[in-house]
Amino acid sequence: MVGHLHLQGMEDSLKEQGREGLLDSPDSGLPPSPSPSPPFYSLAPGILDARAGGAGASSEPPGPSEARAPPSQLPNPPASEMRPRMLPVFFGESIKVNPEPTHEIRCNSEVKYASEKHFQDKVFYAPVPTVTAYSETIVAAPNCTWRNYRSQLTLEPRPRALRFRSTTIIFPKHARSTFRTTLHCSLGRPSRWFTASVQLQLCQDPAPSLLGPATL
């Protein structure tokens, strides 16, 4: 049984050895030439024998009784460990607000019209804490046990009027004299209250007789 071995990079060297063999034959009439040293890329004898045996075995077809060896199956790589995914399912938060005011605020408001002045004095305001702004952020990273949430609650004492008493002073629409009622009230300082009374009467004189303002 003869096998054929094909090696890459050695075809040229085999052709040169064949030519040298023809020159070394006794019919050529030339002295034999020394055999060249094997090339540095020549394979080891064990590798050549193994390849020659494999090539010879491949030339013969396998018998019917011989079973083909199953191809080698590579082991499956280990599946990457899947971490549990964190998703916000339920989130609850309780907020407790104490509505009791710490102190009262007293102020006076003044409304001006074309021919009258309207005062609202003794107005009591209580700072009731009410929710004016609320924001919430929940961050749940996938495949991670890290969670972060932030809640921001803004409370402002929005004043609400509890009780007040109004006083209305009406002047004539075409009054020629100026009557003024002044009301001063400042927090933390002694307050002064001024009240003016105006009495009007009908007369024949074009210039109406007016009584001066009386300070009570």
Swiss-Prot record:
Entries under Pfam families matching the protein: FAM101
Coiled-coil ranges from the UniProt annotation: none
Location relative to the cell: Cytoplasm, Cytoskeleton
Signal sequence interval, chain numbering: none
Region (Disordered): 1-83
Entry keyword annotation includes Nucleotide-binding: no
Subunit structure: Interacts with FLNA and FLNB.
Primary gene name: RFLNA
Assigned protein family: Belongs to the Refilin family.
Name this polypeptide is given: Refilin-A
Pro residues compositional bias, start-end: 29-39
Residue stretches of biased makeup (Low complexity): 57-71
UniProt keyword list: Cytoplasm, Cytoskeleton, Methylation
Cytoplasm is among the record's keywords: yes
